[in-house]
Swiss-Prot record:
May be involved in telomere capping. Residues 104-114 have a biased composition (Basic residues). Signal peptide: none annotated. GO terms for cellular component: membrane. Keywords: Membrane, Transmembrane, Transmembrane helix. It comes from Saccharomyces cerevisiae (strain ATCC 204508 / S288c). It is a multi-pass membrane protein. Residues 94-121 are annotated as: Disordered. This is Maintenance of telomere capping protein 7. It is found in: Membrane. Its main location: membrane. The chain crosses the membrane at residues 13-33, 42-62.
Amino acid sequence: MKKEKKTPTPLPSHHVLFAEPGFFLCNFFFVLLKHTQINPFFYFLFILLFIIYIAIIYFVFIRISHFSFSLCRQCNSLGRMIFMCAYLPAASSRSVANPALPPQKKKKKKKKGTLRTGEVEEQAKGNISFDLCGKQNFQ
């Protein structure tokens, strides 16, 4: 018996088709027509989803790529372009705008309720009074 050589099955191309806007629009309006015959509320829902879809495309491909066009020219693939345009400029500007601060010195806490002997005598005479915040008022 001869062993038959198995040819590798090609990958399904549906994931490529879903990435095309024309194919998405065909599916979108087909599902819209199908479901609006069942329930008219779906018409409003699908139009809302379509507006959100257009807004996402606008912000990802136009706004983000416009602000970092120099990064986009260096990319090969679309996914890498989106990653570089969306994350790297924000990360680099964040690190430049807020550099690591040097460690701050801890302030010594003052003990409340203890006065030096000279201050006690002056307070007894009425020369020094304390307001509600604990600040000294000289009269």
